[in-house]
């Protein structure tokens, strides 16, 4: 797999379930079931990504468990516990023009309407009402900021997102 084809991590494999190699699944998708919309999966085992197919999955109480191709014993499943689950970027669904994957916003420069470079998006936090960009300020920030928290509210604070140019234009006071 080439370096520009780094998998997008959608979850991880949890503990074993039963003696036939089933594993609990932790999904980072909006809904737990969403992770099963993608096939094949890539599993990062011993630092290497490899392809794997989900044979079947089901709810087991509040947990979700899955049977993976080639994993038929509890011992083999234990070897996969805590391995990341990923997919290739081209497997991701296309989004409407005004929606973005978080991974595309990470690393974008944040510039306000006065042209002030406020820093780079380091993380995004889901708060319930709206997502919040955690912007790591530049080393020599004129306002002495280390980090800024900007609500991701398009049309109000977020004026333009240029994913290709890795830049976000905001209406935000750099001293706030």
Swiss-Prot record:
InterPro entries in the record: PRC-brl_dom (IPR027275), PRC_barrel-like_sf (IPR011033), RimM (IPR011961), RimM_N (IPR002676), RimM_N_sf (IPR036976), Transl_B-barrel_sf (IPR009000)
Family: Belongs to the RimM family.
Main location: cytoplasm
Protein name, entry field: Ribosome maturation factor RimM
Coiled-coil region(s): none
Pfam families referenced in this protein's UniProt entry, alphabetically: PRC, RimM
GO CC annotation: cytoplasm; ribosome
Role description: An accessory protein needed during the final step in the assembly of 30S ribosomal subunit, possibly for assembly of the head region. Essential for efficient processing of 16S rRNA. May be needed both before and after RbfA during the maturation of 16S rRNA. It has affinity for free ribosomal 30S subunits but not for 70S ribosomes.
């Amino acid at each position: 797999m080439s370096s520009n084809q780094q998998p997008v991590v959608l979850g991880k494999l949890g503990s074993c379930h039963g003696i036939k190699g089933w594993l609990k699944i932790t999904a980072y998708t909006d809904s737990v079931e969403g992770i099963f919309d993608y096939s094949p999966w890539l599993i990062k085992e011993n630092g290497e990504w490899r392809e794997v197919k989900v044979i079947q999955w089901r709810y087991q109480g509040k947990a979700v468990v899955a049977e993976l191709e080639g994993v038929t014993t509890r011992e083999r499943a234990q070897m996969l516990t805590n391995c990341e689950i990923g997919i290739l970027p081209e497997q991701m669904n296309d989004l409407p023009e005004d929606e973005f994957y978080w991974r595309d916003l990470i690393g974008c420069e944040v510039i306000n309407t006065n042209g002030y470079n406020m820093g780079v998006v380091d993380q995004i936090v889901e708060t319930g009402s709206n997502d919040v960009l955690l912007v790591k300020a530049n080393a020599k920030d004129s306002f002495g900021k280390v980090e800024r928290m900007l609500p991701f509210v398009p049309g109000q604070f977020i004026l333009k997102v240029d994913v290709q140019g890795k830049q976000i234009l905001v209406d935000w006071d750099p001293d706030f």
